[in-house]
């Protein structure tokens, strides 16, 4: 009996002492969007998006233990113009044959009012750069019943030349404005 009670207390101690794990989420592709805009000749904006985006994230009470990762299939680029999309897919720009994905993996997460300050490694066109941005959101909802989800959004600006995409520099702007919005479904 004494051995059994010792075992029960040991199990209870392990349960209490075990660190809580982050809530893990998978991106809901029907509620995830990665869009961009870039200037053309300094006159107007070309708008586009990537249609194939996946990823996961973990939210921990200790924000420094939270994480975010994202993968974009470059062949899914869509600017509503097939000829332009084919050119953007070529070696002049994304070179989708050689670089089929754009990836982001967080390296540091900090809680801020209304969301998280996220720093991480963005790999695009064979170049990896450290980027930082603020994710806004984090409200939770249950929809449909029993499916727990949360969502975030951010806007950031990148220079395409920093990722080796400097073709047509006189015609197309260097700065690309990016908007990311996503919902995750709790695993």
Language model segments and positions:
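Bacterial N-terminal signal peptides
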Residues: 6-15
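Low-complexity, acidic/polar, glycine-enriched regions of mature
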Residues: 20-187
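N-terminal secretory signal peptides that target proteins for export/translocation
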Residues: 1-2
């Amino acid at each position: 009996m004494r051995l059994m009670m010792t075992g029960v207390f040991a199990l209870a101690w392990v349960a209490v002492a075990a660190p809580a794990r982050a809530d893990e989420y998978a991106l809901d592709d029907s509620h995830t969007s990665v869009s961009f805009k870039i200037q053309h000749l300094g006159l107007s904006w070309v708008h586009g998006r990537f249609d194939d985006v996946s990823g996961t994230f973990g939210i921990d009470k200790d924000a420094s233990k939270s994480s975010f990762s994202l993968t974009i299939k470059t062949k899914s680029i869509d600017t509503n113009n097939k000829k332009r999309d084919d050119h953007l897919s070529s070696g002049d720009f994304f070179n989708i044959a050689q670089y089929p994905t754009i990836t982001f993996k967080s390296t540091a997460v900090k809680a801020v009012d209304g969301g998280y300050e996220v720093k991480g490694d963005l790999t695009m066109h064979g170049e990896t750069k450290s980027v930082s941005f603020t994710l806004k959101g984090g409200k939770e909802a249950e929809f449909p019943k029993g499916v727990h989800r949360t969502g975030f959004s951010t806007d950031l600006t990148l220079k395409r030349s920093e990722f080796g995409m400097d073709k047509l520099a006189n015609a197309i702007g260097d700065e690309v404005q990016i908007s990311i919005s996503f919902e995750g479904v709790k695993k």
